[in-house]
Amino acid sequence: MSSSCIEDLSIQDNQWYRIAHEMLGLAGIEINGSRPFDIQVKNPEFFKRVLQQGSLGLGESYMDGWWECERLDMFFQRVVSAGLEKKLPHHLKDTLRIAAARLTNLQSKKRAWIVGKEHYDLGNDLFTLMLDPYMQYSCGYWKDATTLEEAQEAKLRMICEKLQLQPGMRLLDIGCGWGGLSAYAAKNYGVSVVGVTISAEQQKLAQARCAGLDVQILLQDYRDLHQQFDRIVSVGMFEHVRPKNYRTYFDVVERNLAPHGLFLLHTIGSNKTDMNVDPWINKYIFPNGCLPSVRHIAEASEGHFVMEDWHNIGADYDRTLMAWFERFKQAWPQLAERYSERFERMFSYYLNACAGAFRARDLQLWQVVFSPKGVEGGIRVAR
């Protein structure tokens, strides 16, 4: 046992340690245990920090090297399954932030660009090394896939089939990322695509990827769109919209969709209707984001669309995230010159924490197909 472990520091009588020991025991996790999901604590202040600051304290203390865990994904699966995050006291700053989110619009047109600059503009080198050739930063579809490349291409194919794309159609890709879906649809289905993103780095790479194809990549807020499209798709973008803007979002989609068109929404979802913001994720990964619930989507779309199909592939996100993590680890020697060790710990924590939450089925991934007035005879969607 390392001399930095808590047994050697003789603080087991500390009240913070006792509380943490009891709580972790509910998830079957031991402090300085020998199993992959047990934690190794390096700083005795860890317990107080986490119990006082909750999720933010847990994540920041890991970034600071206060604790280690061989399999963070397994640790978080157990923590989430046991509901431990609900037992932690709310940090005052978290409470105030949630209250502010209910009162203010954190995804106004001005604020919407923050996530583009703080996350998606981290650098194309990072995402190029971590993602598949289509650079899909969203859940793959692993039904018949054995590799990340196969899973992401299967996802793209399924989306295009659900939208029933035909040559000559116009497709709007809201939150087009690095242009993978836009390029795939244009090349394989003969459609004309307009993609929008709020990330300058994404636009740059997407334009290069789509060179020679009937694809236009715009750097703008989706709310400024005033065109007509046969089909609209939005993958991994609705998580950034927030409840105050959900109705506006569906207003924009309705305004830009042809009367007999189809719209596919691909989004991470929460099991409960709340502000659904993790303080650590909000600070370090996706500022001003919020996960929608079934109720959020149903209420926001009511009066705009008929819901034709709802498909949950959330279990596949666990495997996608772990594939990203393996690639991130392999690529780290190439990335280390540009990014700090603290960044490496932050990004590893993010990928594994999310994988554990999906594995515990606390998070979902939904693909929802809408039509303006209902498709006569209904539609049979791809699976």
What are these regions (language model features)?
Residues 168-175:
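Conserved class I S-adenosyl-L-methionine
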Residues 178-189:
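Conserved SAM-binding loop of SAM-dependent methyltransferases across substrates and taxa
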Residues 223-232:
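A short acidic, Gly/Pro-enriched loop at the edge of an enzyme's catalytic core
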Residues 268-378, 383:
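Substrate-binding/catalytic lobe of Class I Rossmann-like enzymes that use SAM or dcSAM, i.e.
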